[in-house]
């Protein structure tokens, strides 16, 4: 067959026009598909605003405490447990923080706060009498500061401490009460031994270095419960402590306020009571 040049050009132009139209349709479909993908991605981003959902790490709250059963201590696996530990974990979950527990020497607690090694002190810490020294959250618990003696001791009440040797934890309320004697019930003792931790305090009574020891009732109850034939707690309490969470003064005001509200809610709904009973 003989093709005329004019016919060939016409057919070629028609084929080119069809191909061009087909490409334009495919391009529009491609652009539309991309648009749908971006819209879906945007919707997913809007929906996943929780840092945990999108895989973001929560900010850390560094909590300083010493080893003080049943409030804060290590279990057999080396994991922090106790009333204050569970409470801190529950509160931090609501606040959007990851709690990190830093064990410290308690009588150096202010240094840790001042140099920023910890954000707060959360370890059966007494608020009353220290209201202006820290930025507080709480109180969340009330605790009796009590006195433990050997069962063969003649000490039966606070007045019997006159001329006796008493072991306390350094920088705590019992130390202050015994040294300053602002309470008229407290007599002049022979010696106040200010020790760094409860293990040393318990050992001092076991070995007969002191006549009496003091501490939070829940802690001394555990000590006495392990040897009830050897030790006893006096009925008369030395002090009633309001326990709180301490931040460096004039810092973390908003966080402390929110924390106080959550702690109050946990008191009201019985959550805190259940935690305390768990560690009995």
Predicted regions, residues:
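Short, low-complexity disordered leader/linker segments with a strong preference
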Residues: 3-60
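Ligand-binding clefts/hinges and TM-proximal coupling segments of bilobed small-molecule sensing domains
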Residues: 45-49, 98-101, 173-196, 225-228, ...
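Extracytoplasmic small-molecule ligand-binding "clamshell" domains
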Residues: 52-125, 194
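Periplasmic-binding protein-like
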Residues: 65-67, 142-149, 217, 221-264
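Short, solvent-exposed loop/turn elements at domain surfaces
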Residues: 70-75, 130, 176, 254
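Extended ligand-binding regions for polar small-molecule ligands
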Residues: 82-94, 152-155, 159-165, 170-173, ...
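Acidic, polar ligand-binding/catalytic clefts
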Residues: 89, 93, 98-160, 231-237
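A ligand-binding cleft/hinge motif common to bilobed small-molecule-binding domains
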Residues: 108-111, 124-133, 177-180, 204-240
């Amino acid at each position: 067959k003989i093709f005329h040049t004019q016919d060939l050009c016409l057919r070629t132009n028609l084929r080119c026009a069809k191909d061009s139209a087909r490409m334009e349709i495919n391009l529009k479909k491609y652009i539309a598909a991309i648009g749908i993908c971006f819209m879906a991605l945007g919707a997913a981003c809007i929906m996943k605003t929780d840092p945990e959902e999108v895989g973001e790490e929560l900010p850390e709250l560094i909590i300083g405490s010493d080893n003080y059963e049943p409030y804060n201590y290590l279990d057999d696996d080396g994991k922090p447990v106790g009333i204050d530990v569970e409470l801190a974990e529950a509160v931090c979950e609501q606040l959007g923080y990851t709690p990190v527990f830093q064990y410290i020497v308690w009588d150096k607690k202010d240094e840790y706060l001042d140099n920023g090694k910890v954000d707060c002190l959360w370890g059966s810490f007494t608020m009353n009498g220290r209201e202006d020294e820290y930025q507080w959250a709480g109180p969340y618990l009330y605790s009796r500061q009590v006195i433990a003696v050997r069962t063969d001791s003649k000490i039966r009440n606070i007045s019997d401490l006159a001329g006796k040797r008493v072991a306390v934890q350094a920088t705590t309320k019992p130390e202050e009460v015994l040294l300053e004697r602002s309470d008229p019930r407290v007599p002049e003792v022979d010696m106040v031994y200010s020790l760094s931790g409860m293990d040393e305090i318990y050992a001092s009574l076991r070995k007969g270095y002191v006549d009496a020891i003091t501490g939070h009732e829940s802690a001394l109850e555990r000590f006495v419960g392990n040897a009830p034939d050897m030790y006893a707690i006096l009925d008369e309490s030395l002090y009633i402590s309001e326990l709180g969470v301490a931040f460096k003064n004039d810092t973390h005001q908003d966080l402390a306020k929110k924390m106080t509200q959550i702690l109050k809610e946990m008191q009201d709904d019985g959550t805190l009571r259940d935690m305390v009973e768990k560690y009995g």
